[in-house]
C-alpha cells in the first residue's frame, strides 16, 4: 500500500522505502535500487506500488539535475521575477515555525516529528514549506536552510527544487496553498498521532484539534489562515498575469521543464 500510505505522516513511516538517507550519503546507490526493482517487477502480480516508487527514482534524478544545471538556484528563484515577492522576514515567527509552535496542531505535530526523527513524508514536507512561504509570507531563502538542517536525507537538488515549487517561485508550477485543517482531518482523522506528539491536547476532541479552534487550550496562532492565504494568492497571481512573467516562465520551462520533448 505504498501509494495509499505514503501521504500519511504516521503510516508512511513504515510504508515508504526510507532509503533517502542512503541515497544522500551513498551507502546505497539509486542504480542498485533501480536494478533490483526491475528484477522484482516480473515476479509480482500487483505492480502499481513499485511503478509508483520507480517514478520517484526518476524524479530524484530530475530534481538533482536542476541544481547541477543552474547552481544559482540555491539563492535565486527559478523565475527571477519572483525574488521581488517576499523581501522582508520575521525572525520571531520563523523560529516558532521551525520549533513547531505555530498554534496549528497538525502542522506543529509534523514539525515536532521532524525535529525528533530527521525525516517526514513528502506531502508533509510540502505542507510545511507551503505554510512558511504563503501563510507566513517569508522568503524561502530564509526558511529553506533551517528546514534543511533537520533532514537526515538532505539532498540539495531535491530540497531546493521542492522549496521553490512549494513557494510558487518556479514560474512553471501552479501555486498550491495547503489547507492545514483539511490535511489534519485527511491524514489523522482520530487525532491520535497529533496527541502523541502534542500531549497537552490528549483530552481535546479531534474535531477541535482539526479546526484549530482551541482558544486557551493551545498556543496562539501566528497567522490567520484565511486572510494570509488570500493575501498570498493575490500577490502571486498579481505578477503571474503579466506578459513579462510569461516570457520568463517560458525560459524556465525550456531549461528545467520535465515534459520537454528532446530529439
Label the model's feature ranges.
Residues 5-263:
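C-terminal catalytic domain of photolyase/cryptochrome flavoproteins
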